[in-house]
C-alpha cells in the first residue's frame, strides 16, 4: 500500500 493512498483515505 502506498503512503499516498493511505493519506487519501484519511
Swiss-Prot record:
Q: Could you tell me the keywords of this UniProt record?
A: Amphibian defense peptide, Antibiotic, Antimicrobial, Secreted
Q: List localization entries.
A: Secreted
Q: Which family does it belong to?
A: Belongs to the frog skin active peptide (FSAP) family. Temporin subfamily.
Any one annotated GO CC term: extracellular region
> Its function?
Has antibacterial activity against E.coli HP101BA (MIC=12.3 uM), K.pneumoniae PTCC1388 (MIC=9.8 uM), M.luteus PTCC1625 (MIC=8.3 uM) and S.aureus PTCC1431 (MIC=10.6 uM). Has no or very limited (<3%) hemolytic activity at concentrations of 15 ug/ml and 60 ug/ml, respectively.
Instruction: Provide the free-text tissue specificity comment from this protein's UniProt record.
Output: Expressed by the skin glands.
Q: Which GO terms describe its biological process?
A: defense response to bacterium
UniProt name for this protein: Temporin-ECa
Q: List the disulfide bonds.
A: none
Q: Looking at the keywords, is Secreted present?
A: yes
Q: State the superkingdom.
A: Eukaryota
